[in-house]
């Protein structure tokens, strides 16, 4: 269908695992996914027993698709995606192509990412919005079809169920900090808005393209919540570039100050000799310490942390496990509250 994947273009280290299915029951196209993760009040929704059984029965079919071409207008020192000042024009049929691919694959969760397109007047925000909306139209149509289906052949039934509630995550550029463009994507109907801050403030000028900025990325993430409080916001940080523990903690606090819900930590791996060298290989134990600290001390709703963790890699598996954990915690808290209320009445 002429669609690009960030897995190939960015030389992701997990491509063999993801494309090979990664084992288990989860069906994986180029990354992974999750169950429904936002509710009307913007908090993590709880998975009902029925939803859990459905997820276990059907598995989670997911994909990460890179839209707006495979050529970026920026040249970050850590990234392997090819660059050009003037990439090819956008494919105006891409929203429909993505929708058709998702329909044929029977996906539950789609991660849309993209190259930067500073060459476009709206930097691709309008195109991003169209792709999200087309996917949500597909989800709505599939849901209606399932509701109208009455008896008869079960042919295609599983695909319908998989398309019944498509969760859409958008991993976006910073749109040069133009918040009206951020608004276009944030209000498109997506479920998760991701934008990667990548590294700590001190290292940003060396790691990211000069048009990117630490404060600019924080403003993007904070603005998303201001225009759509219900959406889940997410970011990713690479470790091993020379950052200090205090700088990581400061970054986590800055993210929470801007209402970011989810953070992921992964090991930076040098794509080629032309890219930044690795300063440190962080141990799995240290990654686990960062996960605990992110969730317990800084209050992130969820943190995925490990050497090979990337923005969308194993997202569904991690989220599903986390939602079960959240379920248990909130049920226990509710039971304690009810017990206290009963005791007070007595």
Give the label of every model feature segment.
Residues 1-55, 59-61, 106, 130-165, ...:
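Auxiliary Fe-S-binding modules of radical SAM enzymes
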Residues 6-20, 68-83:
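Local cysteine-cluster metal-coordination motifs and their immediate loop/turn environment
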Residues 62-67, 77-142, 146, 161-181, ...:
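Core AdoMet radical
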Residues 72, 116-119, 175, 242, ...:
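Short, glycine/serine-rich, charged loops/turns that create anion-binding
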């Amino acid at each position: 269908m002429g669609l690009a994947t960030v897995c190939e273009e960015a030389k992701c280290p997990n491509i063999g695992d993801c494309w090979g299915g990664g084992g288990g029951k989860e069906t994986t196209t180029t990354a992974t996914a999750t169950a429904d993760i936002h509710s009307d009040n913007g908090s993590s929704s709880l998975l009902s027993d029925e939803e859990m059984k459905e997820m276990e029965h059907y598995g989670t079919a997911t994909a990460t698709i890179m839209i707006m071409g495979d050529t970026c207008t920026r040249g970050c020192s850590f990234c392997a995606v090819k660059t050009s000042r003037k990439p090819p024009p956008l494919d105006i049929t891409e929203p429909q192509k993505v929708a058709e691919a998702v329909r044929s694959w029977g996906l539950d969760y789609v991660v849309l990412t993209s190259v930067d397109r500073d060459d476009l007047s709206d930097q691709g925000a309008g195109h991003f919005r169209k792709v999200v909306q087309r996917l949500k139209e597909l989800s709505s149509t599939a849901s209606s079809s399932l509701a109208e289906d009455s008896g008869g052949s079960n042919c295609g039934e599983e695909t319908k169920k998989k398309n019944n509630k498509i969760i859409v995550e958008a991993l976006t550029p910073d749109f040069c900090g133009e918040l009206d463009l951020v608004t276009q994507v944030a209000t498109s109907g997506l479920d998760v808005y991701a934008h990667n801050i990548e590294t700590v403030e001190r290292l940003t000028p060396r790691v990211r393209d000069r048009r990117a900025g630490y404060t600019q990325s924080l403003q993007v993430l904070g603005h998303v919540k201001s225009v759509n409080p219900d959406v889940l916001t997410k970011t990713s940080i690479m470790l091993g570039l020379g950052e200090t523990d205090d700088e990581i903690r400061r970054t986590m606090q800055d993210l929470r100050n801007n209402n970011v819900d989810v953070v992921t930590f992964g090991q930076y791996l040098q794509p080629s000799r032309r890219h930044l060298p690795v300063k440190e290989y962080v141990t799995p134990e240290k990654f686990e310490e960062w996960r605990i600290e992110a969730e317990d001390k800084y209050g992130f709703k969820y943190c995925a942390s490990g050497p090979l963790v990337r923005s969308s890699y194993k997202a569904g598996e991690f989220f599903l496990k986390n939602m079960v954990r959240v379920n248990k915690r909130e049920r226990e808290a509710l039971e304690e509250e009810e017990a206290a209320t009963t005791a007070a009445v007595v």
